[in-house]
């Protein structure tokens, strides 16, 4: 397995929220990403999703802060989305009609970069063969298993 674990958009969203069981586990995951940068990756579609969700909910002031903080945290670990990623996502859509287009784009990017694990509260990832979803609520159990060797 690749040591780079994909961080989905709901991790920074929950970490910035209030009064939700996912808040502290997601905040811990972001602290882990800060301390062990080589262990985590995300993609530009996550940034777009953050912008979309906060603007659509009328909470763009907070959303801008969340977006900027996550982009800064992940600065050189945000993968682009290429045409080949979208073509693979389209193929996956034929096989997995219940999985959102965004999640399929993430899955395609993950395949390109060799990442098999995704940290997400979104159970749709459970329906994508070859991916292992790590629920943020289980960070106590799986937390040390995602860290790259040699402290990076």
Per-region residue spans from a language model:
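Acidic, PIN/NYN-like endoribonuclease modules and their adjacent C-terminal/linker elements
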Residues: 2-4, 107, 112-152
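Active-site neighborhoods of divalent-metal-dependent phosphate/nucleic-acid chemistry enzymes
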Residues: 76-119
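Short, flexible helix/strand-to-coil boundary loops that buttress conserved ligand/catalytic motifs
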Residues: 16, 54, 93, 129-132
């Amino acid at each position: 397995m690749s040591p780079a674990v994909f961080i989905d958009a709901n991790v920074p969203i929950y970490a910035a929220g209030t009064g939700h069981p996912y808040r502290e586990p997601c905040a811990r995951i972001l602290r882990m990403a800060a301390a062990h940068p080589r262990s985590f990756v995300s993609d530009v579609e996550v940034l777009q999703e953050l912008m979309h969700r906060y603007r659509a909910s009328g909470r763009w002031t907070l959303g801008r802060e969340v977006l900027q903080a996550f982009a800064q945290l992940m600065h050189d670990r945000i993968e682009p989305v290429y045409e080949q990623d979208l073509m693979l996502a389209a193929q996956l859509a034929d096989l997995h009609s219940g999985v959102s287009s965004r999640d399929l784009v993430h899955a395609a990017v993950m395949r390109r970069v060799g990442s098999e694990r995704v940290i997400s509260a979104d159970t749709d990832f459970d329906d994508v063969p070859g991916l292992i979803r790590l629920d943020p609520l289980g960070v106590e159990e799986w937390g040390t298993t995602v860290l790259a060797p040699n402290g990076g």
